[in-house]
Amino acid sequence: MSRKKQAPVRNVLADPVFNSKLITKAINCTMLEGKKTTAQNILYSAFKLVEEKLQKDALEVFRQAVKNVTPLTEVRSRRIGGTNYQVPMEVRQKRQQTLALRWLILFARKRNEKTMIVKLANEIIDAYNKTGGAFKKKEDTHKMAEANRAFAHFKW
């Protein structure tokens, strides 16, 4: 166990446009090399694109997309008697949101569209429609947990 103190959880300020902490966290995940205004422009432009394509409120679409991508269970390695077992565990609330945002942005970056704005908008739409890379990642995570259910009694 680490002897150091755990870092205190810092309060995230709500973003200026939508007044949402979830959007601020998404901006921070999108940000590269400390360029926050660029990340904000990308996210807000992607939201405009989502509104144009779906004719629905972008914030509600984004919240539903994050909800669709949020994992409930995951597997974690545990060493018992010289063997590593993949033990399925429930994911804590904060980690659920973090993983969902991380996967959305990761799979948006992997897409083949021209700009990050279009990539992110299409990944949000796909997650909203329960398709796309981020949703597939969630499904794969749940399948792994289901496949290793026999080791659930090794929880700690």
UniProtKB/Swiss-Prot annotation:
<dbReference type="GO" id="GO:0019843">
    <property type="term" value="F:rRNA binding"/>
</dbReference>
<comment type="similarity">
    <text>Belongs to the universal ribosomal protein uS7 family.</text>
</comment>
<protein>
    <recommendedName>
        <fullName>Small ribosomal subunit protein uS7</fullName>
    </recommendedName>
</protein>
<dbReference type="InterPro" id="IPR005717">
    <property type="entry name" value="Ribosomal_uS7_bac/org-type"/>
</dbReference>
<dbReference type="Pfam" id="PF00177">
    <property type="entry name" value="Ribosomal_S7"/>
</dbReference>
<dbReference type="InterPro" id="IPR036823">
    <property type="entry name" value="Ribosomal_uS7_dom_sf"/>
</dbReference>
<dbReference type="GO" id="GO:0000049">
    <property type="term" value="F:tRNA binding"/>
</dbReference>
<comment type="subunit">
    <text>Part of the 30S ribosomal subunit. Contacts proteins S9 and S11.</text>
</comment>
<keyword id="KW-0820">tRNA-binding</keyword>
<keyword id="KW-0687">Ribonucleoprotein</keyword>
<dbReference type="GO" id="GO:0003735">
    <property type="term" value="F:structural constituent of ribosome"/>
</dbReference>
<dbReference type="GO" id="GO:0015935">
    <property type="term" value="C:small ribosomal subunit"/>
</dbReference>
<dbReference type="GO" id="GO:0006412">
    <property type="term" value="P:translation"/>
</dbReference>
<comment type="function">
    <text>One of the primary rRNA binding proteins, it binds directly to 16S rRNA where it nucleates assembly of the head domain of the 30S subunit. Is located at the subunit interface close to the decoding center, probably blocks exit of the E-site tRNA.</text>
</comment>
<dbReference type="InterPro" id="IPR020606">
    <property type="entry name" value="Ribosomal_uS7_CS"/>
</dbReference>
<dbReference type="InterPro" id="IPR023798">
    <property type="entry name" value="Ribosomal_uS7_dom"/>
</dbReference>
<keyword id="KW-0699">rRNA-binding</keyword>
<keyword id="KW-0694">RNA-binding</keyword>
<keyword id="KW-0689">Ribosomal protein</keyword>
<dbReference type="InterPro" id="IPR000235">
    <property type="entry name" value="Ribosomal_uS7"/>
</dbReference>
